[in-house]
């Protein structure tokens, strides 16, 4: 929905992230990007009706991930919002919206789980999707670190494992990419689809290391979980 790389004509790119999660149990957004105008423009280009969304999961409170939230809530006020900040949760509730802060691992819908908030310099939470007996981790920027994020995800996952990682990895250099790949390989990650704050150099390195397990990502990318 939103990324700094667009893969299809007619879709706008911008620094930020938003991923549509469309499952039988729930239709939701993982992050919302920097502006509602951008989000709505890409949704319309993709023939997606934002009023059909049931929930929004915010990984962390940086503007490039949460900037569109107020506009989206004005457009679709029935949304349930999962926030990493309990104080903001109270503010949203007082404004009449349904909001929740999941400090600990929890199930959101059938096959959908939250890792709980990883506290640190930048508080962040990851979303887990279980499909075909495999767990996929969605990550906004992985500010806590890929090791810490995966440890939390493995703990929260019904499979006690993570098969695929999709999202921003906050990796810039080749050495960081190599270290991340080594750890992901160690814990059993077989598929990766990096975007947003993952540098072009890191993407290129990860593409070589993961080989057939690498999936190009960007606005317009569609990943069917039963095919990975």
Which residue stretches match the model-derived regions?
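Active-site metal-binding motif and surrounding structural segment of the metallo-beta-lactamase
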Residues: 37-82, 157-165, 185, 190
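Structural motif
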Residues: 27-28, 55, 79-80, 111-113, ...
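Cap/insert and terminal regions of metallo-dependent hydrolase folds
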Residues: 68, 135, 141-223
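Glycine-rich phosphate-binding "P-loop"
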Residues: 1-11, 105-116, 170
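Conserved beta-strand hairpin/beta-sheet module of binuclear metal-dependent hydrolase folds
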Residues: 1-45, 124-139
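Short glycine-enriched loops at secondary-structure junctions
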Residues: 33-36, 118-120, 142-143, 171
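Metallo-beta-lactamase
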Residues: 83-125, 131-132, 215-228
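Active-site neighborhood of phospho(di)ester-bond hydrolases with catalytic His/Asp-centered motifs
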Residues: 29-32, 53-61, 82-85, 137-141, ...
């Amino acid at each position: 929905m939103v990324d700094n790389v667009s893969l299809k004509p007619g879709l706008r790119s911008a620094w930020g992230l938003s991923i549509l999660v469309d499952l039988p149990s729930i239709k939701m957004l993982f992050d919302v990007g920097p502006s509602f105008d951008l989000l709505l423009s890409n949704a319309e280009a993709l023939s997606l009706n934002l009023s059909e969304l049931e929930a929004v999961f915010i990984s962390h409170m940086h503007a490039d991930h949460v900037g569109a939230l107020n506009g989206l809530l004005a457009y679709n006020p029935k949304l349930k919002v999962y926030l990493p900040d309990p104080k903001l949760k109270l503010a949203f509730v007082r404004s009449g919206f349904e909001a929740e802060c999941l400090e600990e691992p929890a199930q959101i819908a059938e096959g959908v789980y939250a890792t709980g908030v990883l506290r640190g310099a930048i508080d962040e939470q990851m979303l887990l999707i279980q499909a075909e007996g495999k767990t996929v981790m969605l990550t906004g920027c992985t500010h806590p670190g890929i090791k810490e994020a995966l440890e939390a995800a493995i703990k929260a996952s019904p499979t006690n494992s993570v098969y695929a990682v999709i999202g921003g990895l906050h990796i810039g250099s080749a050495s960081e990419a190599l270290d991340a790949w080594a750890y992901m390989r160690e814990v059993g990650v077989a598929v990766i689809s990096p975007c947003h704050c993952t540098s072009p150099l890191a993407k290129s390195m990860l593409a070589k290391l993961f080989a057939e397990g690498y999936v190009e990502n960007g606005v317009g990318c569609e990943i069917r979980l039963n095919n990975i």
